[in-house]
Structure formats: C-alpha cells, structure tokens
Amino acid sequence: MKAEPLTDFSRLCVHTITTKGWGLEEAVEHYAEAGVSGITVWRQWLEGKDPAKAGDLIRSTGMKVVSLCRGGFYPALEEKSRGESIEDNKRAIEDAAAMGAPLVVLVCGAVPGQSLVESRKQITDGIAATLPLAEALGVKLG
C-alpha cells in the first residue's frame, strides 16, 4: 500500500524536540511557514524565557499550544528526589498554564533497582500530589 502525501495539516502538531537544533523562535517560525497548526514545547525550550510570552509568540502565528512536554519522572529511590520531582512537576504545570498549554505530557517510567510495583505506587502518589494544582489551573496531565 502506498502512503498518500500529507496535505491536511489542520490537526498536525510538531514537538520542538523534532528540530532539536532550533531555538523556540526559529521552530515557531518554520513550523508556521510549513502550515503546522500546533506545537508541543519541550521544557528546555522555555529555559530563560517567560512562558506567557512564549505562548503569545506561538499564538501570534496562528498556531495552537498543544502541550508542554515533559513532566513525570516521579519514581526515585530516595524520598528527597521524589519531593524534588513533585516540585518540578508543579513548575511544569504552572508554566503550561502561563503559556496556555492545556496539557502537560507525563513520562513516568521506572527506576533501575526498584520494583515496578513500587515505581507505579510512586507515580500514583506523584500524580495525586500534583493533580490539585493542575485542576486549579485548568491543565490536564497525560
């Protein structure tokens, strides 16, 4: 079966990691020129930037901010690391809300040397600890 060329970009979203060598401004410019309608911003593209201004930049091109990537990483061998992860996820939620992203993409995984059961429990606990803020700010976790 031959694949048909993509001609309808109305629901296309590109992650900034796809064009790792481009900064946020360059990615937004090129994606918009190509007719991409949505963007998922990876958190490192926001370093040193105001998330609200980043969202404004994206919307100024007619694109939608689809999500902010990545949150999660809740499992850890040490309690201190789990607490730091929860605080980092709260910052991601706040950044997503500021830029107008309706979703934070969670990449949860597991930790070597820890049982899958324990990692899953820590993921559940981490989401439970961050969900009230996400709900209050209107940001989904997925």
PLM features: residue spans?
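General N-terminal targeting signals
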Residues: 29-31, 36-41, 53, 80-82, ...
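Conserved, mostly hydrophobic/aromatic
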Residues: 14, 31, 39, 58, ...
